[in-house]
A protein has these predicted regions:
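Short glycine-/acidic-enriched loop or helix-start segments at secondary-structure transitions
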Residues: 30, 57-59, 83, 136-139
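Cofactor-binding loop segments of dinucleotide-utilizing enzymes, especially the Rossmann-like FAD-
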Residues: 49-53, 75-76, 129
Length: 144
């Protein structure tokens, strides 16, 4: 068991400087934030976030927003449970200041936006919020 690794949990791709973590609930987000804080990053990361509407995403946002510079919202690939990228962006823009928010039409657009932003800052890209979000981005970019 000591060597078991759960796919989608704290998977860092060094060559692309992308961290995949399927923090899909409050406990998961708390763990992700603790890890990001432990890394003592010089530049706050860019977050690609897609969440399910039946999760406590309000508390998840309260925890993650202070440690990131930008959030790119994406709709998870689960039509019945997904919180849309537009709804998530509206929640962020209404309730949080000092955070850049962009809406991606799909996983491919989300990673493209994040890579474009990173060209100027070299910030870590963090993909999180649900296994659906991670799966779509990993498949799209052959990072599985």
């Amino acid at each position: 068991l000591a060597n078991v690794k759960l796919v989608g949990r704290m998977n860092y791709h060094k060559t692309s400087n992308i961290l995949f973590d399927a923090a899909h609930n409050v406990d998961g987000i708390n763990g992700l934030v603790a890890a990001l804080n432990a890394w003592h990053l010089k530049i706050k990361p860019t977050l690609i976030l897609g969440v399910l509407k039946d999760k406590d995403y309000h508390e998840m946002l309260d925890t993650i927003v202070p440690v990131v510079q930008r959030i790119i919202t994406v709709t998870p690939n689960n039509k019945t449970r997904a919180l849309s990228a537009d709804e998530l962006a509206a929640e962020l823009l209404t309730n949080y200041q000092n955070i850049d928010v962009e809406i991606a039409s799909d996983a491919s657009a989300a990673i493209s936006l994040a890579m474009r932003v990173r060209e100027s800052s070299q910030a870590l890209i963090v993909v999180t919020g649900s296994f659906y979000t991670l799966s779509a981005i990993q498949k799209d970019h052959r990072m599985a």
